[in-house]
């Protein structure tokens, strides 16, 4: 199938199964956080996964290439991003296993059956409305700041849509870790696994990967840190493995 690119769009190679993704650099492009989340999340054979705030569909497409899950759905509120995601799915001939739904995370309980997903992933906006400078480009601002949804919205939605024993995987920023752990527990999502991501071995962490289980027992494993760069411009071997180079 021939997929036509619109003005400003480009095809980017995902280094996985020959998959490519349509993006518009002037709007928003996926970052390393999404790729790391796709490597951290686990989807078993036969399981159904949902990505909240999927953007251009990077996480469902990567998870389709990395796991044996049955079906992957991406939920995205921005019409332009959802359109790019749908066309990327068609370009990669994944329409039988990946679907994109345009809609609001806060209304996901009306879009999907409750307790219907085995796995939910999310790479939500990191910054609260009053934290940091809001990007003047609205698509970028929505992706980075809690303009259309909050951490509470994301975690509350995950609780509603996960089956009992279902898993929630999220990437976020360490400065909000205490708040994240409290909200997860409040919504019966027990933190089970955590990994801090450091840009360099001698720097502070700038990302945190978290796995929580709906209705799980209290016990969390802190995995060894993930170091992104061995030196400037040279990825750590683990990063190359996650990207699939």
Sequence positions of predicted segments:
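Class I SAM-dependent transferase core
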Residues: 2-45
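General small-molecule cofactor/ligand-binding pocket signal
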Residues: 22, 99-101, 192-195
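Residue-level signal for inorganic ion chemistry
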Residues: 37, 123, 154, 212
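SAM/dcSAM-binding transferase cores
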Residues: 204-245
């Amino acid at each position: 199938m021939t997929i036509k690119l619109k003005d400003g769009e480009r095809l980017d190679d995902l280094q996985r199964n020959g998959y490519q993704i349509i993006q518009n650099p002037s709007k928003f492009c996926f970052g390393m956080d999404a790729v790391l989340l796709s490597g951290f999340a686990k989807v078993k054979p036969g399981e159904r996964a949902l990505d909240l705030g999927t953007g251009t569909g990077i996480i469902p497409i990567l998870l389709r290439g990395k796991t044996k899950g049955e079906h992957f759905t991406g939920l995205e509120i921005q019409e332009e991003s959802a359109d790019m995601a749908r066309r990327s799915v068609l370009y990669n001939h994944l329409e039988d296993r990946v679907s994109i739904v345009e809609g609001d995370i806060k209304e996901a309980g009306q879009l999907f059956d409750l307790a219907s997903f085995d796995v939910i992933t999310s790479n939500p906006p990191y910054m609260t409305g009053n934290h940091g400078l809001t990007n003047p480009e609205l698509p970028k601002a929505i992706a980075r700041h809690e303009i259309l949804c909050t951490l509470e919205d994301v975690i509350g939605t995950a609780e509603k849509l996960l089956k009992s024993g279902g898993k929630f995987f999220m990437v976020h920023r360490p400065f909000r870790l205490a708040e994240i752990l409290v909200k997860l527990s409040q919504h019966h999502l027990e933190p089970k696994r955590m990994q801090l991501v450091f840009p360099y071995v001698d720097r502070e962490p700038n990302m945190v990967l978290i796995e929580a289980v709906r209705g799980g027992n209290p016990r969390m494993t802190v995995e060894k840190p993930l170091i992104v760069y061995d030196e400037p411009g040279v990825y750590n071997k683990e990063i190359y493995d996650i990207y699939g180079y």
